[in-house]
């Protein structure tokens, strides 16, 4: 491993902090698929030391680590908070894969830092398992996301709403820099802002370094807005509600970042709110694209000392254009369509209105749309409380499919390739957590393996490919998760 490149930034961007180790910790799980992708040859003993925070002076030297807590600010539920930073996580260092891509190793649940405020800096088994599951589920679905490498846990109890077992997780991503880092840099002045812009371009957008120097900051802002728009489109298409889209939870490289009270849809509800702390619905499913552009406006304002007003406007326009194009593209793929037409947006929108009205299971509807017009199409119609209301839409869909150059077999295959047979529903995550809390981690490992290939049939998980019971649906969580 190597020391984090983040240390190249001015010292007011971080504090050096050692983790508060877990005592008698065990390695709960290792993401061997990710280990292979990273060409990572760390032993289980080494991973346990990293994941549990048991880093002695010798191990710090051997690993070549200088752990640090990052300082940033951000807008939380629309209000600026200047007192943010890594309150329970530490950037340990970075690993280079065989392509020399640097991957940051970040320890979530590392203990208190100067930015913990009144928190204890710890994480619990429930929350790290939820992050592990969600990041791997999104990765399997083709949605940009941070990843999870390993989990460690111990018998130490941490007080939340109840006492829960302490745990920690190694999060992996090329960078943990958030929109909030730029808000912090802007508050420090133009020199700090320019230093952060130059750092991000050098390490994460190197193609922009070829532009004239006075165009680079504006190009970076535009690129980040574009990636964020693409991410929003993908979230909407897979039925993912993040729940806490504060600007300090927005990745500068357009990845899903910081998993709390998230949810994948059971029944489709356009105004669904997964976070029961979000009483006003600011981060409801249908608000996510709007909040995405709102956060980009915050980012553009933070760039204000280094870009022109015209560059800010161009970046935000780029978000809107990118989102509109990407969203239709993602949804058309779910419908088995290979081309785009002007009427497709209405076809998609009208379908979602029907699904919302009848509370149709989101993932199962699109998966079973492959059966429309076939002997087993009743598997699709059984999802509908009033199938007759869908008939006009089905007719429009048939007409639209007829305009494609795809055979029926290819339409079906395109649908199956773009709609998962299994999805990480909240009740499934809760079952996995409950098993883990009594020492059974097999369901966790089995599900992570399955979530890496969600478009396959998985006959062993057939019971999870049916609509959940009323008791299993709509489980909401709070930010404490």
Swiss-Prot record:
EC numbers: 2.7.7.-, 2.7.7.108
Region Disordered, residue ranges: 458-481
UniProt: ATP binding residues: 85, 87-88, 108, 120-121, 171, 178, 258
Name of one Pfam family that matches: SelO
Matches recorded under InterPro entries: SelO
Active-site residues from the entry: 248 (proton acceptor)
Enzyme class: transferase
Catalytic activity from the UniProt record: L-seryl-[protein] + ATP = 3-O-(5'-adenylyl)-L-seryl-[protein] + diphosphate; L-threonyl-[protein] + ATP = 3-O-(5'-adenylyl)-L-threonyl-[protein] + diphosphate; L-tyrosyl-[protein] + ATP = O-(5'-adenylyl)-L-tyrosyl-[protein] + diphosphate; L-histidyl-[protein] + UTP = N(tele)-(5'-uridylyl)-L-histidyl-[protein] + diphosphate
Similarity section: Belongs to the SELO family.
Name used for this protein in its record: Protein nucleotidyltransferase YdiU
Lineage: Bacteria, Pseudomonadati, Pseudomonadota, Gammaproteobacteria, Thiotrichales
Gene name of the record: ydiU
